[in-house]
Amino acid sequence: MPRYAVKGGEVTLKCDHSVRLEHLHKVEWKKGDDKLFMYVKGRTPPFKAWEIPGAKLNTRKSSEKQIHLTNLTFAAGGSYYCVVSMETPSIFTRDSDFKDLTIIDPQDDDPKITFKKDTYYIGEMLEANCTTAPSKPPPHITWLLNDVKVRDSFTKSFSNGIVHGHGYFETKASSIKQLSMEVSQLEDGKLRLTCMATIPGYVNNDSDYADIRNSTVYIEILEESPALPSPVEAASSATLLTLNCMLVVLFLWLF
């Protein structure tokens, strides 16, 4: 059973059991204490459906093995399970494990990365912010440095306090995460900075996510910052300039 489904979309919930059809008596689908769908072998028709909050049941795609829900809203989220009953040698009933379904309203744009400049010197502090598009639930943000996850100690999460939409079921929110770390030596002189915005949170780069958006920027890294004159050199230059000015004045006075 999928863990996530998209608002307005559809989902198939499967009841995996190994009972052969000739031994099967009944299969029920429930959400909490509420009945959703029931199959009883030998009845005509064999199916009976109840109203499902937040979804419509497609009976043509439902059977003793699965139910198919369409037109999903947030109210369809919750814990589902199936109950399988056998008729031989005597009626035996067993409940499946509860499986949670979360309805999401995904991001409609890539995250935005902002930073003060696109060139840094080794040893400087790099600070960047990543802001996601709104979604429900809010996306999780993961920073990647040259495709490697940045340690959480270098990041800090913020809330912009902006809620999009009205009512509990329609509100969406953005996520913000700051990166702050010292720039180190890089072989190619380039730093590839990626912001991943995902639902659910980060597992690895190749995982399947219910919702994923990426943004990548490249930052040039220079080995040395421009050399500044030492106090002694600065003082010597000032003294030399003063002497040159005095010589010019003396020359003009004599001639």
How should each PLM-predicted stretch be described?
Residues 1, 106-114, 226-229:
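Proline-enriched interdomain boundary motifs that mark the N-terminal boundary
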Residues 1-5, 18, 114-120, 132-133:
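Short beta-strand segments of immunoglobulin-like
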Residues 10, 75-79, 125, 188-192:
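Extracellular Ig-like/FN3 beta-sandwich strand-entry sites
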Residues 14, 55-100:
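Ligand-binding face of N-terminal immunoglobulin V-set domains in extracellular IgSF glycoproteins
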Residues 20-53, 136-160:
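N-terminal V-set
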Residues 51-66, 165-180:
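Aromatic sugar-binding surface patches on proteins
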Residues 79-105, 191-228:
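Extracellular/luminal immunoglobulin-like beta-sandwich modules
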Residues 236-255:
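Cleavable C-terminal sorting propeptides in eukaryotic secreted/cell-surface proteins
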